Amino acid sequence: MRIDPKRSRLKMVEEQIAARGVADKNVLDAMRRVPRHMFVQDALASRAYSDSALPIGEGQTISQPYIVAVMSELLQIESGHKVLEIGTGSGYQAAVLAEMGADVFSVERIRKLFISARKLLFDMRYFNIQLKLDDGTMGWPENAPYDRIIVTAGGPEIPQYLIDQLADPGILVIPVGGQRRVQRLMLVTKTDGKIETTDMGGCAFVDLVGKQGW
């Protein structure tokens, strides 16, 4: 069955995201614009706008639209913000952040995903996104500090390297907790050198792999 991507996208935003309390207009508008079906495997395109995470290969997933919206809203993105993303995946979250006006620096550790995301984002003319193939738990120090940092995989703790690369003031959003996709979504703020963390609730992500991950 063929889907109408635009209609499905608008329905996704209204029924799965806005209806569940996400109110940031910048987030909602960005997710209305980004064609999620372009970031999933062809065989799963009919499910691209469903309320679920989907496999993208290499044991990784594209996050559920609602959790993408929640994390994006927590970041409080303003135009021109430098945002570090750990875990490019297929590139969907990076595209949403770019549509919100951010300059995105995204790190991916899996070569195949890095190559495919780089090509897709370039073809879609997201020139405000830079990608790097590396251990994301180490951040991207050459371009630090970052106004915002988002981690799209769950680790055992908040990597100190990422805290060090966070601007002051700055916001970091990261899933933290046990392996096997059971974590707590943590909101980390840095203000006048002081670090505060707030538990925003349960979540389920693939494992954060790297020197400061699993």
UniProtKB/Swiss-Prot annotation:
Which enzyme class?
transferase
Q: Which reaction does it catalyse?
A: [protein]-L-isoaspartate + S-adenosyl-L-methionine = [protein]-L-isoaspartate alpha-methyl ester + S-adenosyl-L-homocysteine
Task: Tell me where in or outside the cell this protein is found.
Answer: Cytoplasm
Q: Which gene encodes it?
A: pcm
> Which family would the database say this protein is a member of?
Belongs to the methyltransferase superfamily. L-isoaspartyl/D-aspartyl protein methyltransferase family.
The UniProt record lists the EC number as: 2.1.1.77
Q: What is this protein called?
A: Protein-L-isoaspartate O-methyltransferase
What the entry lists under InterPro entries is as follows: PCMT, SAM-dependent_MTases_sf
Question: A single GO CC term, please?
Answer: cytoplasm
General function of this protein: Catalyzes the methyl esterification of L-isoaspartyl residues in peptides and proteins that result from spontaneous decomposition of normal L-aspartyl and L-asparaginyl residues. It plays a role in the repair and/or degradation of damaged proteins.
* GO MF: protein-L-isoaspartate (D-aspartate) O-methyltransferase activity
Q: Which GO terms describe its biological process?
A: methylation; protein modification process; protein repair
Provide an example Pfam family for this protein. PCMT
Coiled coil regions, renumbered to chain: none
Entry annotation: catalytic residues: S63
